[in-house]
């Protein structure tokens, strides 16, 4: 579950790439819940279990006219996994899932950004639990413009799915719990 969460965070980072007229660099604004990386996985096939990574950092570039030039980079502290249940979180941090003692960070680095009818497809490499695999996120620009403090911001939402076994997370959670859905929302502040 935690591995899925990490993947979700990585996917979220990828989605943070989106557009302005010139390729501008944005720093992800984590303060005040302006950005989050969440995940969900089926619990016994009956309901959803939600979680998040509370400690991450990243940046993205955004050029509305040339999405192919966009980049997304995110680093996630895997120890920050949070499902609002201390014992489960401890288990997720263990060798059976995220193995945070050996792999304290997960990273996402985009390799391709393409415009589509709904927004942007962001493809990148997610490194989680010591394994690097390509991940695809579907992203939408939620808005952009000047903020009240003299800065310029752009926001994106994204989602994608990862398979636990792809990242060497082999604990059997049942047939309904083999994939983790990543849910990302990011707001970036443009560098001055």
Curated annotation (Swiss-Prot):
GO cellular component: periplasmic space
Signal peptide extent: 1-23
InterPro entries listed in its UniProt record: Lipid/polyisoprenoid-bd_YceI, TTHA0802/YceI-like_sf, UPF0312/YceI
Subcellular location: Periplasm
Keywords, in A-Z order: Periplasm, Signal
Pfam families: YceI (PF04264)
Coiled-coil regions listed in the entry: none
Main location, first listed in the record: periplasm
Family statement: Belongs to the UPF0312 family. Type 1 subfamily.
Record PANTHER family: PROTEIN YCEI
Protein name: UPF0312 protein YE1254
Organism this protein belongs to: Yersinia enterocolitica serotype O:8 / biotype 1B (strain NCTC 13174 / 8081)
